[in-house]
From Swiss-Prot:
Protein name: NADP-specific glutamate dehydrogenase
Gene3D superfamilies, per database record: Glutamate Dehydrogenase, chain A, domain 3, Leucine Dehydrogenase, chain A, domain 1, NAD(P)-binding Rossmann-like Domain
Family: Belongs to the Glu/Leu/Phe/Val dehydrogenases family.
The gene coding this protein: gdhA
Lineage of source species: Bacteria, environmental samples
Function: Catalyzes the reversible oxidative deamination of glutamate to a-ketoglutarate and ammonia.
Catalytic activity: L-glutamate + NADP(+) + H2O = 2-oxoglutarate + NH4(+) + NADPH + H(+)
Residues that, per the record, bind substrate: 92, 113, 116, 167, 379
Domain of life: Bacteria
């Protein structure tokens, strides 16, 4: 087999083999464009078709999910599990329930997950799954029957040393509980095969808070290394769900002034900044009433920008926590005119063009595989607690989480340059790649 001699020939070959998968191709392009100079300096990583194997999932499982709705009608959905790479441990990654779910998105997420999990320093491989099922507006009975029907096929592909899923968009603690319960019934085994579980049956403290907390821990380390900090900074947060809420909570502890949140309907702007009391009000609307940001704005008498994202609001720090590709080149051109740092709380919320614009402008930029890895890290800590049949106090989990995020930041600096300004994209990509690649080379051609 002839191996590609340039990044463009490698990516062209990948595109021929994966047509009509834009999200996946974007993710691979972003990683390998930054990796290629490092690979050229280290030719050992071109041996054994390592790169070609690295971009091909080890296994893709696709199946139908047939279930009965509240009216007695049979519904059919499509579901997937992409078991991407197990070189350093069992496949690990969430199950996403959303109408947009397709193979391209799940391959992109599984690919990213492989490197993100490697960065945590915990023994976890990369995987991702999901279904085009939409839980919005559906009764608890419908959601339960769907989750149970899905598990009648998925259960045979899971195990504590094989594949350990978790929640994701549209798949929270309730859905994880339904799936974990059905898994236990089908397998007659109570071993840990899901993370993100409820505290009453093996969940970990700090898990709901982890991604948001970790995003702030990493961003603060990045700021501190460059002589900055959160105190007094104007912060734009996109999204208003779990990640956004706990990002705001931790940023407030560091005396930041968070002035935006958003959802698919538009953006709220609060120039006075969030407080603990305001955040509790937002959480009550979003988590208990399942309301919208517009409802919060109306009840508070605040500015609401219908149909707009937060990026037109002047800020010092931008933390995109909503969804992929929400921050494009046009938004980057606006926001970079004063922003000092951007850190990804969602998975790939910044387009390649926007990322390049930030880096060209000298803006500190933290990619999601590093900055939002804390959710995964805490999932790994949940697996460790389950394996030992113990539960740790919240303080212990939080301390471990802070250490893990500090280690990730250190690895990014080590590989991204220890000079005046670290290139965190290169650092994160190279650090994750090296760990996975070394494991694959050591294990032979598989």
């Amino acid at each position: 087999m002839e191996y590609a001699v340039s990044v463009e020939s490698f990516l062209s070959s990948l595109q021929r083999h994966n047509p009509h998968q834009p999200e996946y191709l974007q993710a691979v392009r972003e990683v390998f464009t930054s990796l290629w100079p490092f690979i050229e300096r280290n030719p050992a990583y071109r041996e054994q078709a390592l790169l070609e194997r690295l971009v091909e999932p080890e296994r893709i499982i696709q199946f139908r999910v047939s279930w009965v709705d509240d009216r007695g009608q049979v519904q059919v959905n499509r579901a997937f599990r992409v078991q991407f790479n197990s070189a350093i441990g069992p496949y690990k990654g969430g199950m996403r329930f959303h109408p947009s779910v397709n193979l391209s998105i799940l391959k992109f997420l599984g690919f990213e997950q492989t490197f993100k999990n490697a960065l945590t320093t915990l023994p976890m491989g990369g995987g991702k799954g999901g279904s085009d099922f939409d839980p919005k507006g559906k009764s608890q009975g419908r959601i339960m029957r769907f989750c149970q029907a899905l598990m009648t096929e998925l259960y045979r592909h899971l195990g504590p040393d094989t594949d350990v899923p978790a929640g994701d968009i549209g798949d929270g603690g309730r859905e994880v509980g339904f799936m974990a319960g059905m898994m236990k019934k089908l397998s007659n085994n109570t071993a840990c095969v899901f993370t993100g579980k409820g505290l009453s049956f093996g969940g970990s403290l700090i898990r709901p808070e982890a991604t948001g907390y970790g995003l702030v821990y990493f961003t603060d380390a990045m700021l501190q290394r460059h002589g900055l900090g959160f105190e007094g900074m104007r912060v734009a947060v996109s999204g208003s769900g779990n990640v956004a809420q706990y990002t705001i909570e931790k940023a407030l502890e560091l005396d930041a002034r968070v002035i935006t949140v958003s959802d698919s309907g538009g953006t709220l702007v609060d120039e006075d900044g969030f407080t603990t009391e305001k955040l509790a009000h937002l959480a009550e609307i979003k988590n208990q009433r399942y309301g919208r940001v517009a409802d919060y704005a109306a009840e508070r008498g605040l500015t609401y920008l219908a149909g707009q994202q937060p990026w037109n609001v002047p800020v010092d720090i931008a933390l995109p926590c909503a969804t992929q590709n929400e921050l494009d080149l046009e938004a980057a051109r606006v926001i970079r005119n004063g922003v000092k740092a951007v850190a990804e709380g969602a998975n790939m919320p910044t387009t390649i063009q926007a990322t390049d614009a930030f880096l060209d402008a000298g803006v500190l930029f933290a990619p999601g595989k590093a900055a939002n890895a804390a959710g995964l890290a805490t999932s790994g800590l949940e697996m460790a607690q389950n394996a030992a049949r113990i539960g740790w106090r919240a303080e212990k989990v939080d301390v471990r989480l802070q250490h893990i995020m500090a280690d990730i930041h250190h690895a990014c600096v080590e590989y991204g340059g220890e000079g005046k300004q670290t290139h965190y994209v290169h650092g994160a990509n190279i650090a994750g790649f090296v760990k996975v690649a070394e494991a694959m080379l050591a294990q032979g051609v598989l």
